[in-house]
Amino acid sequence: FWNLDGIYSELLAVDGVTSAHVNCNRENVVDSNGWLPHSRIYVVDGGADKDIAEAIYRKTDRAIAENGSVSVTVTDIQGIERIVKFYRPETQIVDFKVTVLPESTNITNIIATIKSYIDSISIGGLITQTNAIEAVRSAGYLTGTGIQYLEVKFALGGTGSYNPTLQLEYNKKPSGNLVT
């Protein structure tokens, strides 16, 4: 009921919600993210503010502090107004580079598939070369093509620091950007 999984599931069931991230700070001090001591955080993409606030209210203990830039008033069954807080995600540009050997006529499809994979990652998710290549393979763009090597690397937009994996911050949703 009040656990993070229950809250997460309730948020994903809200009409229009496409992604969510739920976490907490169990410590007695403000943490490195700026979260209040003994508090919860909810980052929700999509859905109406009021519907999200009501879902959070139904699944949480109101004595636990919340972090957020969105504040919504929910009225409880006694007529008392309660403030529910949550965040909306920020878009994180994710630059990516693709190396295909030998060069392939499928490169446009491969790039589009990798961009779709990146864009499908949840708020605060992990983007990996392995999963990007699997998306390309599953789409049928590797079989029978003669491709012997496919490498995909990712970087936070504009940083130029490319790696085979990229962990997004808790409040970021990705948007893929091919860099050539």
Where are these regions (language model features)?
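Carbohydrate-recognition loop of C-type lectin domains
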Residues: 1-128
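An aromatic-glycine-centered, glycine-rich loop/turn in mixed alpha/beta architecture
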Residues: 87, 105-180
